[in-house]
């Protein structure tokens, strides 16, 4: 849908250069990248994993005003699928539900583009954004608001010949507010465009339609039909040390996840401190959950692939490295139709490490 990478090859070249040998693709509502991921991993002797991500809605949590893993929207819950089958096996009713939710997600961004063009016309920007061209040039079929931000930044670059002219044009587009980002920092400029125009309160903001969010149970069913493991992504501690309503009581969160049928959880390690990650992952492993880690690349900023924590740029602690590998073994085993972490370890040792 959107990433900092120019293409799959760049992402995997970075992984190989950083000595990351087990690599997973993860995209919103899409498995379209699986073939290229598989083939390019093979060319670099990397082990591919196949994942997917959804935004779901839990009506019970929404009614209770409970923030789960979206800190701003009670009941809205991000879910991942780990170790999906490749070649893709999803078909029938579940495949149609996935196609429908992806189409609605794209339609919401198309409505946003129309509103953005109305704003550009009102401020006499001198150009507009061609939605079909954005989809063709900047996406593989899944379009997000970040693509609109990138398209607008590129349009301003094309319309204004020098830095001073671009700054003046941004000030007009932003309703008299000057651009705060350095004009040469494309990633920062795109983030500012998104924040000022496309998010809530912005001139081109369009709220997401409830149709874009499937019930949690339906998402889990789609993931299982695709051969994957339904997985709950923990936010855990934010930069101020705060937790969401759902995650603050770890024991209660684990019990609720079990009742809802989850056996797998994941963390994006750069979001959290080492101490919190170790505490949460130790507890969740003891409770029988598969625990996996991942990196985050859904902004314009190009970040390393090798895992690290918020308070340790050098990498993971030895305890977290072992947790990470154990989780990778569990997912690799599932993906290969094997039945244990040990079998996954043997598979990875043989195929990745040549042991």
Where are these predicted regions, by residue range?
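Active-site-adjacent pocket scaffolds in enzyme catalytic domains
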Residues: 305-307
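Long, low-complexity, polar/charged, intrinsically disordered or flexibly structured peripheral segments
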Residues: 164-205, 213
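A basic- and aromatic-enriched beta-loop-alpha substructure that forms the phosphate/nucleotide-
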Residues: 65-95
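Exposed alpha-helical structural elements
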Residues: 93, 147, 151, 165-169, ...
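Short, charge-rich amphipathic segments
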Residues: 36-42, 143-155, 176-190, 210-220
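An N-terminally biased module of ancient metal coordination in phosphate/nucleic-acid-related enzymes
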Residues: 1-76, 192-226, 232-302, 311, ...
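Non-catalytic, alpha-helical, charged scaffold/linker segments
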Residues: 87-172
């Amino acid at each position: 849908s959107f990433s900092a990478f120019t293409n799959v090859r760049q992402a995997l070249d970075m992984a190989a250069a950083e000595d990351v040998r087990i690599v997973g693709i993860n995209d919103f509502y899409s498995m379209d990248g699986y073939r290229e991921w598989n083939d390019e991993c093979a060319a670099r002797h990397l082990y591919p994993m196949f994942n997917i991500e959804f935004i779901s809605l839990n009506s019970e949590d929404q009614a209770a005003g409970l923030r789960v893993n979206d800190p701003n929207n009670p009941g809205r819950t991000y879910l991942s699928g780990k170790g999906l089958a490749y070649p893709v096996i999803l078909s029938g009713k579940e495949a149609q539900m996935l196609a429908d939710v992806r189409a609605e997600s794209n339609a919401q961004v198309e409505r946003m583009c129309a509103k953005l063009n109305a704003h550009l016309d009102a401020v006499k920007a001198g150009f507009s954004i061609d939605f079909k061209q954005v989809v063709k040039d900047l996406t593989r079929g899944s379009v997000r608001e970040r693509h609109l931000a990138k398209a607008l930044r590129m349009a301003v670059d094309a319309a204004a010949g020098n830095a001073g002219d671009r700054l003046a044009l941004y000030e007009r587009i932003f309703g008299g507010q000057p651009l705060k980002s350095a004009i040469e920092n494309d990633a920062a400029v795109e983030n500012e465009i998104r924040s000022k125009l496309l998010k809530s309160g912005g001139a081109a903001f369009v709220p997401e339609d409830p149709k874009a969010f499937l019930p949690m149970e339906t998402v889990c069913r789609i993931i299982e039909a695709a051969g994957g493991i339904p997985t709950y992504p923990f936010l855990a501690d934010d930069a101020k040390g705060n937790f969401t309503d759902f995650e603050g009581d770890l024991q209660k969160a684990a019990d609720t996840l079990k009742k809802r049928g989850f056996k797998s959880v994941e963390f994006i390690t750069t979001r959290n401190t080492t101490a919190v990650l170790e505490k949460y992952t130790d507890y969740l492993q003891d409770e029988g959950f598969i625990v996996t880690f991942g990196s985050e690349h859904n902004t314009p900023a190009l970040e390393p692939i090798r895992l690290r924590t918020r308070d340790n740029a050098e990498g993971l602690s030895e305890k977290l490295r072992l947790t990470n590998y154990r989780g990778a073994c569990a997912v690799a085993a599932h993906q290969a139709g094997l039945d244990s972490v040990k079998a996954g370890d043997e598979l990875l040792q043989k195929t990745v490490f040549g042991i």
